[in-house]
Amino acid sequence: MGSKNKIQRFKENKTFINLIQPNREKIIKKQFEFKGNWSLNYFKNNNPIVLELGCGKGEYTLYLSELNPKINYIGIDIKGARIWRGAKTAIEKGIKNVAFVRTQIELISSLFSNGEIDEIWITFPDPQIKYK
């Protein structure tokens, strides 16, 4: 992907209502607005929440969200140009039970309260285990 394309995607990311790009300082200072309130303040329902860590382009997150409309899905990844694809596709398809968060995975304990998440998936770990 060319750098112009990447810059354009970063700009577009700022317009997506289903893509949250929290400020690292706010996360560290425990000022993240959705912590403990994802169900009511973001999804507006009490359905279970499933996280996919390292979601990349969000294909798996999107597939599951379409397959299970009574479950809320959140894909997390640090790469803005990748997560752009999932957020854009969800908007184009009108999928309401999915969100994407662009942040480092090691910060997730500051994004969610204890018991707020029902399942966590790491579908395609990177780096993958290498056997010698």
Where are the regions that the model predicts?
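S-adenosyl-L-methionine
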Residues: M1-I49, E59-E66, A87-G115
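Conserved short alpha-helix immediately C-terminal to the canonical SAM/SAH-binding motif I
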Residues: R82
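Class I SAM-dependent methyltransferase "Motif I" SAM/SAH-binding loop
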Residues: G54-G56
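Short beta-strand element of Class I
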Residues: I71-I74
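Mobile active-site "lid"/loop adjacent to the S-adenosyl-L-methionine
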Residues: I117-K132
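Conserved SAM/SAH-binding beta-strand->alpha-helix loop
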Residues: K79
